Swiss-Prot record:
Its main location: secreted. Glycans are attached at residues 153, 244, 252, 396. Residues 20-118 form a propeptide. Residues 1-19 form the signal peptide. Pfam families: Inhibitor_I9, Peptidase_S8. Residues 35-116 form the Inhibitor I9 domain. InterPro entries: PCSK9_ProteinaseK-like, Peptidase_S8/S53_dom, Peptidase_S8/S53_dom_sf, Peptidase_S8_Ser-AS, Peptidase_S8_subtilisin-like, Peptidase_S8_subtilisin-rel, S8pro/Inhibitor_I9, S8pro/Inhibitor_I9_sf. This is Subtilisin-like protease CPC735_047380. It is an enzyme of class 3 (hydrolase). One of its GO terms (cellular component) is extracellular region. Disulfide bonds: none annotated.
Length: 400
């Protein structure tokens, strides 16, 4: 009898250890009430995943009936499979969340929070200097020198607020991909058009022959959620596979927020799928290890520098940064054929995405080696980079 009790106690303890975890946010100010991302255990079959989702949909429906058809919690919105990483997101009531937690197929549940664009401050009549800086080892030059391949046959996914794909800057090389933010398939704030112009615009772009695919995850307020962002990443990975561009694809993420385990895991899964991931480090002058998606494993995190090779006062810093790039007073495209100047790590990241696209086309380098190659080429120029932070400034290796 004693042996049976020991076995029962062990199994009970094992069940506790294996129970799914409901993660807490580091502060609730960015929380989206009642919205969650549910992440499944590694190795779960597709059939088991679908079985779980259907089961929880029934639970949600039953709970809704008990609430007298209150639709404030409306169930699954997005399902994800990013290189084997499986999850889903939506709105669920507390009873449904408890049922999800009790399912042994679930790894953890993360409350949804908002993430924001990292480039907002504008200043009229500022000079455009970033292209000249990244193609010379010393500052002060305004000419842009680059390899003639110019990112040709490379696809860059602009995960942002959308892109004005008809803007003359893109010369027909930009297409609309997916909208995971709202019901408006346009760039309402200009942020995504600006960053994409830096990546691949004919005038302002680093990789002037690369293709842009608009993946909208930020709404008219410049905000998005865990679920929408992961949906954008999921869509981009599937699109890259369907179009045979894995290994020749870049994803730029000029946004961020507090730590999200789910987004970080989704981004890392995209890296393993053959997408080179670039992320803005953030604009809070703090350690980027506590910012998502810049802190994700395998993501190339970028801080912002000034025209004087200083760390921009707003830029995040820390050991997670791969490199600094121009991010202060950057001119680029805006919707309806316009142009404007912005500053932020949002403006720095697309310089790196553009250089990555050029390196893929010119050196035929694999996406798994790109961040290291970019760091190899970069020059030690940043003054006062921050504690435990690289002093490397982006350089495209032009020889100038």
């Amino acid at each position: 009898m004693a042996r049976i009790n020991v076995v029962v106690s062990f199994l009970a303890a094992l069940a506790v250890v294996q129970a799914a975890q409901l993660l807490n946010l580091d502060g609730q100010k960015d929380a989206v009430p009642g919205s969650y991302v549910v992440v499944m255990n590694d190795g779960l079959s597709g059939l088991d995943f679908e079985s779980h989702v259907k089961s929880m949909a029934k639970v949600q429906k039953a709970n809704a009936l008990k609430r007298d058809f209150d639709n404030t919690a409306d169930g699954v919105k997005f399902k994800y499979n990013i290189n084997g990483w499986q999850a889903y997101s939506g709105k669920f009531d507390n009873k449904t969340i408890q049922s999800i937690l009790d399912d042994p197929r679930v790894n953890y549940i993360e409350p949804q929070r908002t993430f924001r664009a990292f480039g907002w401050v504008t200043q009229d009549n500022a000079p455009s200097w970033g292209l000249g800086r990244i193609s010379h080892t010393s500052r002060g030059r305004m000419d842009y020198v680059y390899d003639s391949s110019a990112g040709e046959n490379v696809t860059v996914y602009s995960v942002d607020s959308g892109v004005d794909i008809s803007h003359p800057e893109f010369e027909g090389r930009a297409i609309w991909g997916v909208n995971a933010a709202d019901n408006s398939d346009v760039d309402q704030i200009g942020h995504g058009t600006h960053t994409s112009g830096t990546i691949a615009g004919k005038t302002y772009g680093v990789a002037k022959m690369a293709k842009i695919v608009a993946v909208k995850v930020l709404d008219a307020g410049g905000q998005g959620t865990n679920g929408g962002i992961i949906q954008g990443i999921n869509w981009a990975v599937n699109h890259a596979r369907q179009n045979n561009v894995t290994g020749k694809a870049v994803m730029n993420m000029s946004f961020g927020g507090g730590l999200s385990r789910a987004i970080n895991e989704a981004a890392s899964s995209a890296v393993r799928a053959g997408i080179f991931m670039v992320a803005a480090a953030g604009n809070n002058n703090e350690d980027a290890r506590y910012t998502t998606p810049a802190s994700a494993r395998g993501v190339c995190a970028v801080g912002a520098s000034t025209q004087n090779d200083l760390k921009a006062r707003f830029s995040n810093w820390g050991p997670t940064l791969a490199v600094y790039a121009p991010g202060d007073r950057i001119w680029s495209a805006m919707p309806d054929g316009g142009r404007d100047v912005m500053r932020g790590t949002s403006m720095a990241a697309p310089h790196v995405a553009g250089v990555a696209a050029v390196l893929i086309s010119s050196e035929k380098i694999g996406t798994d080696r790109l961040c290291e190659r970019i760091k190899e080429l970069s020059v030690s120029s940043i003054q006062s980079p921050g504690a435990d932070t690289t002093d490397k400034l982006l350089y495209n290796g032009s020889g100038q």
